[in-house]
Amino acid sequence: ERLLPHAQMIITGMQRAKVDVALADNMHKQISLAGTPNIWDAFLQFGITNIVSAMPGVSLVAEVKAQQESTRLLLERTLDLAVLFDPPKVDELVVERICELPIIPVSAFETANSENFFDNQYVYVDWGTTFSLWHAREFNGHAPPYFRTSTGRIALDLILKCGGSAFIPKLLVEEQLKAGDLYHVEDVAHTSRDVFVAYHRDNEQTPLLEKLVTLLTELQIKT
């Protein structure tokens, strides 16, 4: 078991080497991009097609990874770029803040307000460490959340089908708010999360990574 991480690193390296050979034959570059499930739900999914269109000649590998795994892969140089809520504090990595993501209180119940928001089938979504600390100060429910998840999409689907309330990024619920399927509970406090990118400072594809970071930043401007 102790050798398993080392074996996984070797396999990942071999797989990437095979892809690199194929890319070299076709004169393409490859960039691997990873985000946590919540990053994909709340941010990356809305711009991945624009990124692909803006980088012709680049083969993009997009993956869902937990934060700790992304950090490890960056340090092993088997991942080029990670998009994260809680950036790693590692000297070998370049970390940049690219945007701020508004997270708002929404409910399937039109009568939801600050007095009953947390007691009416409240779904807790883990939006990272900073959010957890903020949430601990704001929570005034009389019982624990009736459902917990680390994925915003699961929370959204649940409250749409079964009713309830949750803190969800505004970008993810805009259509439901316009359609009247969800309601913004405006007298409940809202928050936001900073989104960061990280890559190895010695990455040989830094110019391409910088272009990708610029595209991600522009994605926030467009949204």
Which role fits each region the language model picked out?
Residues K65-N120, T129-W134:
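Acidic, Gly/Pro-rich loop/turn segments at junctions of secondary structure
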Residues V94-I104, A179-S192:
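Short beta-strand->loop
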Residues F118-Y146, G152:
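Secondary-structure junction motif
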